[in-house]
A protein has these predicted regions:
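Short helix C-cap/helix-to-loop transition motifs enriched in small/turn-promoting residues
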Residues: 130-132
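Bacterial N-terminal signal peptides that target proteins for export
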Residues: 1-9
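Exported/periplasmic ABC-transporter solute-binding proteins
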Residues: 20-89, 93-94, 98, 105, ...
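Residue-level signal for mature regions of secreted extracellular proteins and peptides
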Residues: 13-14
Length: 305
């Protein structure tokens, strides 16, 4: 994520290029309560370490959470003293999951870790196995959607992406040799969206051909992949649907892949402190109310446990 970006909820345009950035820069934004004169007890501050791709949706989720009474799985209000979330100050640090994980291991005082994948929360549990017998298990709070995007082509005539339609798209370029058609995807070794895009192309028997002909441009992360496609540096790009929705891209410019055609892009979180609101907020993330916000932002819903 670009270091110039200090996230403020009114900057949605910049959030697109920063989402899933995978960089080592850390950006912090606060959602501050109306507590009297700003005097907030430590128990009224919830510190969240969040993957950069959540910068466009998490502020909305936090606002909704603070606007309602404390949530529990049974849909019942808990102790009245603990139900006013508007008095809770929530501090969010956005960065790559890897950097956040390193900060947590170095003792950073986070209460909740929201990763861009399932690997880091699982690794945290493994590390804590011998020291914290009461550690909570990871939970899945979001499932990303993959899309093929072209900023200068009309993709509306194509109803579904398969081997035949991909060959037509990637080999047809007016007034140019077919080998000049470039496609970008995020680094499959580092980015969940890139790994899923690679798996999709392999399933359609197109990955090796594109790679061997040097037409497959590997971006550092999903944010850079979006930038390449958005600026027409490449003809096509495998990007996150949430990026397209955030950027208000016309639907005719992209195709959403069928969810069953690539490995699920699941994002897990884990409570890493005894803060009561950390558990409460983690449960809210999995609620129908929060999931509807994720769906509006371009994610697939997660079944409420």
């Amino acid at each position: 994520m670009s270091p110039f970006m200090k996230l403020i909820f009114s900057l949605p345009a910049l959030l697109v290029l920063a989402s899933c950035s995978g960089t080592d820069n850390t950006t912090k934004t606060d959602t501050v309560s109306n507590a009297n004169n700003g005097k907030t007890k430590s128990a009224q501050v919830l510190r969240i370490a969040a993957a950069a791709n959540l910068a466009g949706i998490l502020p909305t989720v936090i606002e909704a959470y603070q606007a309602k009474a404390a949530y529990n799985k049974d849909g019942q209000n808990i102790d009245r003293q603990d139900t006013d979330n508007s008095k809770l100050k929530i501090e969010v640090t956005y960065a790559s999951s890897g950097k956040l994980f390193a900060q947590i291991n170095s003792g950073a005082p986070y209460d909740l870790f929201l990763s861009a994948d399932q690997a880091f929360p699982a690794k945290y549990v493994q590390q804590q196995a011998n020291t914290r017998s009461t550690a909570q298990p990871p939970f899945t709070y979001a499932r990303g959607q993959l899309a093929l995007y072209s900023s200068n082509k009309d993709l509306s005539p194509i109803k579904t992406l398969d081997k035949t339609s991909l060959q037509q798209l990637f080999s047809t370029q007016p007034n140019a040799n077919s080998n000049t058609v470039k496609i970008t995807l995020a680094n499959p070794d580092l980015a969940p969206y890139g790994a899923s895009a690679k798996a999709f192309l392999q399933q359609q028997e197109g990955f090796n051909e594109l790679s061997d002909s040097k037409r497959l441009i590997q971006a550092e992360n999903i944010g850079q992949a979006f930038q390449y496609a958005h600026t027409a540096t490449t003809d096509y790009g495998f990007v996150a649907l949430s990026q397209l929705i955030s950027a208000k891209v016309k639907p005719s410019k992209y195709l959403v892949l069928q969810p069953e055609s690539y490995p699920a892009i699941l994002q897990d979180g884990i409570v890493i402190s005894d803060h009561p609101k950390a558990t409460d907020f983690s449960q809210y993330l999995q609620s129908e109310s929060a999931q509807s916000l994720f769906v509006d932002a371009g994610y697939l819903p997660i079944t409420n446990p």
